[in-house]
């Protein structure tokens, strides 16, 4: 999420940008500081609302998964526009804009923007050489970004071990 938000911030040059994050999110906080981005730390959602009331931003870009309706409604009392990213929670229905680049749904409101047309790519990816497409699958890599609280990695690994017996020519990494 941090890299996504940094990419967005880099592309909003000329705008006053401030990152607000919970102080316990140390790796993300460190990355923002390394990127020389202005950062304000908070301890709770309540403290965030107090900060927003005081700072009075024009737009809040909220990169939180599964927001609750009450949270977004409260935020909209103090902010002109609320944008949420990768948000499938009920709160997203109350945001002004929802950008869900990782999902292809299209069944929710007009404030939703779905799919790969809305991905924020870092500059490094524009320079990358596309991989050669192989008709025959030879290698499979499964990567879940960030944390894995549902232990999907282990579940996928166990499935790959079972599949590998039927397809010994495929390498799982």
Across the structure, where does each feature detected by a protein language model lie?
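Active-site and donor-binding regions of nucleotide-sugar-utilizing enzymes
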Residues: 4-11, 21-112
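Short internal beta-strands
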Residues: 16-24, 170-173
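A nucleotide-sugar donor-handling region in carbohydrate enzymes
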Residues: 94-151
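Generic structural signal for beta-strand residues in well-ordered domains
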Residues: 75, 91, 133-134, 165
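Histidine-anchored nucleotide/phosphate-binding helix
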Residues: 1-13, 154-161
């Amino acid at each position: 999420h941090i890299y996504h938000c940094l990419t967005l911030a880099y592309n909003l040059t000329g705008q006053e940008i401030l990152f607000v994050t919970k102080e316990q999110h140390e790796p993300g906080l460190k990355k923002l500081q390394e990127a020389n981005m202005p950062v304000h730390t908070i301890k709770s959602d309540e403290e965030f609302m107090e900060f927003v009331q005081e700072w009075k931003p024009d737009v809040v870009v909220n990169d939180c998964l599964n927001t609750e309706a009450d949270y977004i409604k409260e935020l909209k009392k103090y902010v002109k526009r609320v944008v949420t990213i990768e948000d499938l929670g009920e709160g997203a229905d109350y945001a002004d804009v929802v950008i869900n680049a990782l999902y292809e749904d299209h069944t929710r409101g007009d404030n939703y923007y779905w799919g790969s047309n809305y991905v924020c790519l870092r500059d490094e990816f524009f320079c990358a050489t596309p991989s050669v497409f192989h008709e025959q699958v030879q290698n499979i890599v499964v990567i879940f970004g960030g944390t894995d609280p549902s232990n999907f990695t282990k579940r996928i690994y166990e499935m790959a071990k079972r599949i590998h017996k039927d397809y010994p020519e495929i390498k799982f990494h």
